[in-house]
Curated annotation (Swiss-Prot):
Function summary: Participates actively in the response to hyperosmotic and heat shock by preventing the aggregation of stress-denatured proteins and by disaggregating proteins, also in an autonomous, DnaK-independent fashion. Unfolded proteins bind initially to DnaJ; upon interaction with the DnaJ-bound protein, DnaK hydrolyzes its bound ATP, resulting in the formation of a stable complex. GrpE releases ADP from DnaK; ATP binding to DnaK triggers the release of the substrate protein, thus completing the reaction cycle.
CXXCXGXG motif repeat residue intervals: 144-151, 161-168, 187-194, 201-208
Protein name per UniProt: Chaperone protein DnaJ
HAMAP family: DnaJ
Binding-site residues for Zn(2+) 1, renumbered to this chain: 144, 147, 201, 204
Region (Disordered): 145-167, 351-389
Biased composition (Basic and acidic residues): 355-389
Main location: cytoplasm
Family: Belongs to the DnaJ family.
Gene encoding the protein: dnaJ
Higher taxonomy: Archaea, Methanobacteriati, Methanobacteriota, Stenosarchaea group, Methanomicrobia
Length: 389
């Protein structure tokens, strides 16, 4: 299947173009490619392409859906006929007849499908990772139980529209630049239904539908991420009699976690450690989605080193296995030191670089003369004791 071109590209417009710009451009292109005027090969297909782009972009609701979801947002929500329904083509022929054949001529549009709805669902990091069932309350329109959706008062029924004779369409003919164009527009009296209600239902005032609320449970699968869309078929607004209800689209939003971040199916976390733990090594308990686990920090670990905890990440959608947890080590530098800690660090610096401050050397020499020799711990043990006590 060929990939559809971008509607804005077809009309040569940008996404911030006004409705007037869209209408003006369409009229110009439609006049150029209308098959009654342009007999070149491909002109009719070009005209259809232009008309489809205009039908979507000239309608605020369809345009918003397209801007957000692209062609998928239009194809999933509207039938081919719904795309063109209600658009003002400015007299450039019978668009319905051109797209759908002569069978559309003279017939009512038929019952309209219900509108799709969207609901933003917020879940915690853990709920998205493990899956959760959430109860939601959706405002929507439902079929009126009093009139069964007809809009007519009980005991009565809708009548044929006198304005269009029940066709749902009004045809007009006009001449432009010496050419005669036939236009079919939706009947304004019956809005394309072919019927009118003379005695409206007292419950829905003739609309056939009423506002209501629907409580339901939504299953968010393990591994869901922000932006994921769940489609619940038939849970949108009610359609007209004989037409299906729209769908409900649940947009998942995952709230931020205090410690964890997510990249694909991996969990990212940071682990602050002391510089003695980094230098000497240590076994440290690390928080994961599945509880605390022991992780070994080898001696000589540098700050920003990353350690991988296998299978401690997010469950993969529609697949087996999990991601990993990536733990980035952050070495903390102490800001308040005791004299003992400073002395030990000076000694460490001397052993590392062979240079010791003269004042410290004299002080330590005098101290050693006044003390009796005794067995002492190694330098690293002293440093560890001093900084972890």
């Amino acid at each position: 299947m060929a990939t559809k071109r971008d509607y804005y590209e077809i009309l040569g417009l940008s996404k911030d173009s006004s409705v007037e710009d869209i209408k003006k451009t369409y009229r110009k292109l439609a006049l150029q490619y209308h098959p009654d005027r342009n007999k070149e090969p491909g002109a009719e297909e070009k005209f259809k392409e232009i008309s489809e782009a205009y039908a979507v972009l000239s309608d605020a609701e369809k345009r918003a859906q397209y801007d957000r979801f692209g062609h998928a947002g239009i194809d999933n929500q509207y039938s081919a006929e719904d795309i063109f329904r209600g658009a003002d083509f400015g007299g450039f022929g019978d668009i319905f007849e051109m797209f759908f054949g002569g069978g559309r001529r003279g017939g009512p549009m038929g019952p309209r499908r219900g509108s799709d709805l969207q609901y933003d669902l917020y879940v915690t990091f853990e709920e998205a990772a493990f899956g959760v069932r959430k109860d939601i309350d959706i405002p929507r329109t439902e079929r009126c139980s009093t009139c069964s959706g007809t809009g007519a008062k009980p005991g009565t029924s809708p009548k044929r529209c006198p304005n269009c004779g029940g066709t749902g369409q009004v045809r007009t003919t006009r001449s432009t630049l010496g050419m005669q164009f036939v236009s079919t527009t939706t009947c304004s009296a019956c809005h394309g239904r072919g019927q009118v209600v003379e005695s409206p239902c007292p419950t829905c005032s003739g609309a056939g539908r009423v506002r209501s609320r629907r409580k339901m449970s939504v299953n968010v699968p393990a591994g869901a991420d922000s932006g994921m869309t769940l489609r619940l078929s038939g849970e949108g607004d009610a359609g007209e009699p004989g037409a299906p209800s729209g769908d409900l689209y649940i947009i998942v939003h995952v709230m931020e976690h205090k410690y964890f971040k997510r990249v694909d199916y991996d969990v990212i976390s940071e682990l602050p450690i002391s510089f003695t733990q980094a230098a000497l090594g240590a076994d440290i308990m690390v928080d994961t989605l599945y509880g605390k686990v022991k992780m070994n920090i080898p001696s000589g670990t540098q700050t920003h080193s990353v350690f991988r905890l296998k299978d401690k990440g997010i469950q993969r959608l529609q697949g087996h296995g999990k991601g990993d947890q990536l733990v980035r080590v952050i070495i903390r530098t102490p800001t308040k030191l005791t004299q003992e800690q400073k002395d030990l660090l000076h000694q460490f610096e001397y052993l590392s670089n062979g240079k010791k401050p003269e004042a410290e050397e004299r002080s330590r020499s005098d101290k050693q003369k006044s003390e009796k020799p005794r067995k002492s711990k190694g330098l690293f043990e002293k440093v560890k004791d001093a900084f972890e006590s």
